[in-house]
């Protein structure tokens, strides 16, 4: 839908070709290739960005919000957004906006009735030191893993659990390998829309040139 809107609003001057489900690489690969300009546009969860943009750790504070409306209001705050624009710009990116997929929840094959039930569970997390510390604090055994490996990891028993928003759990059919969902709601699943800063500036200059094709 986004690609269609861009083509329509630019009168066909810009066309986006979408590559979903890590087709163009993992989270780290996407950030590096976006910075280099090979993939000019990336739609990505904020969590993997902390390695390249340390100040994005502000999104990794667990249990900061009780409702998704509070979480959305936080990133919509004009002063906050302007500060984050500078963070991305310093890293060589242009921030176009934020979206979300609701809160992240935990799916598992063990019925979690108390905090003690987290102990020892091998849970897949993203490659983010703050996420790892959170789950270790609960007594779990967090394991960083690229998302494309999660389904087979659950299937083969490499991991016992994972955490994602409901939309991701359903669309990827992770429920086929899990018995329970625990509404931890520990973090909002923020999505950032970024382009390389160089590409953004060039696009402003050359938008009147023949149709441009983008990969995201």
Residues of each region from the PLM?
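N-terminal secretory/targeting leader peptides
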Residues: 1-71, 79, 84-208, 212-215
